[in-house]
Amino acid sequence: MVDIIFHYPFLGAMGDHSKKKPGTAMCVGCGSQIHDQFILRVSPDLEWHAACLKCAECSQYLDETCTCFVRDGKTYCKRDYVRLFGIKCAQCQVGFSSSDLVMRARDSVYHIECFRCSVCSRQLLPGDEFSLREHELLCRADHGLLLERAAAGSPRSPGPLPGARGLHLPDAGSGRQPSLRTHVHKQAEKTTRVRTVLNEKQLHTLRTCYAANPRPDALMKEQLVEMTGLSPRVIRVWFQNKRCKDKKKSILMKQLQQQQHSDKASLQGLTGTPLVAGSPIRHENAVQGSAVEVQTYQPPWKALSEFALQSDLDQPAFQQLVSFSESGSLGNSSGSDVTSLSSQLPDTPNSMVPSPVET
């Protein structure tokens, strides 16, 4: 918290901060005496010039309008202090806001969306069992699978994980380390051991118990030993193998479902809306609109050319029509000349009368 204090400067000799006289104010930032009218004080007893109190990272001036943080003798604004020294998510390394809900695992803090298994990426919900291994979250199924692989892959490694067993050597009483040849020989004996064959009744009993609880406790295993007549080791190995097979099967089914979903949603690598092609149609039928009747004026020379193309021409009348057209007196002649000329022409439809035609 930054406070502004009205200061009356003390006109005394400047001295050390530890030996300052009553009424003097020494700036923590520059170490000189403060003669300004106002002093910026940071709780509990740190006093600054107004020009000296600023963030050590972004050089933003700090006053009573913002929050000031002091760490190792340096002042920071709230944004830089949270970025540098605030608690961050152990998964995404992003800070938290005051409204975020978090999940804690020992000393690590996670966002709710980041609290997932590092193997199968399944989100861990409240009530789920998980393990924290080298700052990585593991769900119960993946943790058990990891223990099984460690037990099968490195049986003689120092500090075995729970559930892992080493090789049983005949000369276990001797404290000497077995030679490399003996170790290879024992490995060969392990690969050629006799497999345990289960009958139908034993298999049905184990499957029924597995459907009820894939991870039976010690009491349930003792009951299975009495019911099936098998050794505890055979029952434990059968449950381990069954869980491993179901895990692989579920992963394979999930991959197949994702592949089918991606095949349906994409076409040759391009994602879009699927369309169905229809039958081909004529172009004019596809044009939408209403028919419009267009009327044009037919000039006189067109009627004259149509009259000239007729086969049964009356030569005297045609010669008179041609001479009449060439004289150019169609528009200047009297009405009687036009009437007499029309009476001499053969009776043909639309010979000289302009009529509207459809185009």
UniProtKB/Swiss-Prot annotation:
InterPro entries, A to Z: HD, Homeobox_CS, Homeodomain-like_sf, ISL1/2-like, ISL1/2-like_LIM1, Znf_LIM
Cystines in this chain: none
Subcellular localization, as worded in the UniProt entry: Nucleus
Positions of region (Disordered): 151-190, 326-359
Polar residues bias locations: 337-359
Domain LIM zinc-binding: 25-86, 87-149
Assembly information from the UniProt record: Interacts with LHX4.
Record protein name field: Insulin gene enhancer protein ISL-2
